[in-house]
């Protein structure tokens, strides 16, 4: 005669907590297993995604109005006329480097308003 799963469940339900603990320990030893919950593989420390705090404003093209682009670059950087002209003509060029996100976005808006193509890195 074979014992069914239902009969085993009923028999376990009638045991005290201490008897269930002893039963589990005996089953672990008999079958060489552990009743502990399976633990996911050791994942390394959670990657911390750091928000970028410093940005470079790169002008890739100056658009159709080079004079306005030169004026905007001079105003933003304090460069002289020749240096600003050389910078604008050598696109793509970093207009400002290592500035805050707010300053970078403001400068980008000014440059895009005059028709320049700008990237933030």
From Swiss-Prot:
It holds the Pfam family Ribosomal_L12_N. The keyword tRNA processing does not apply. GO terms for molecular function: mRNA binding; structural constituent of ribosome. Coiled coil: none annotated. GO terms for biological process: translation. Keywords: Ribonucleoprotein, Ribosomal protein. It comes from the Bacteria. One of its GO terms (cellular component) is cytosolic large ribosomal subunit. Transmembrane segments: none annotated. The keyword Ribonucleoprotein applies. PANTHER family: 39S RIBOSOMAL PROTEIN L12, LARGE RIBOSOMAL SUBUNIT PROTEIN BL12M. Belongs to the bacterial ribosomal protein bL12 family. Forms part of the ribosomal stalk which helps the ribosome interact with GTP-bound translation factors. Is thus essential for accurate translation. Homodimer. Part of the ribosomal stalk of the 50S ribosomal subunit. Forms a multimeric L10(L12)X complex, where L10 forms an elongated spine to which 2 to 4 L12 dimers bind in a sequential fashion. Binds GTP-bound translation factors. This is Large ribosomal subunit protein bL12. It comes from Psychromonas ingrahamii (strain DSM 17664 / CCUG 51855 / 37). The gene is rplL.
């Amino acid at each position: 005669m074979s014992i069914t799963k239902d009969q085993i469940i009923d028999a376990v339900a009638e045991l005290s907590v201490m008897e269930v603990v002893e039963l589990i320990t005996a089953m672990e030893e008999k079958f060489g297993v552990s009743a502990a919950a399976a633990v996911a593989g050791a994942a390394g420390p959670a990657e911390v995604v750091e928000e970028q705090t410093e940005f470079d404003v790169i002008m890739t093209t100056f658009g159709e109005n080079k004079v306005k682009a030169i004026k905007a670059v001079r105003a933003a950087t304090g460069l002289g006329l020749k240096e600003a002209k050389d910078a604008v003509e050598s696109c793509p060029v970093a207009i400002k480097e290592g500035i805050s996100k707010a300053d970078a976005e403001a400068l980008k808006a000014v440059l895009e308003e005059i028709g320049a193509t700008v990237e933030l890195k």
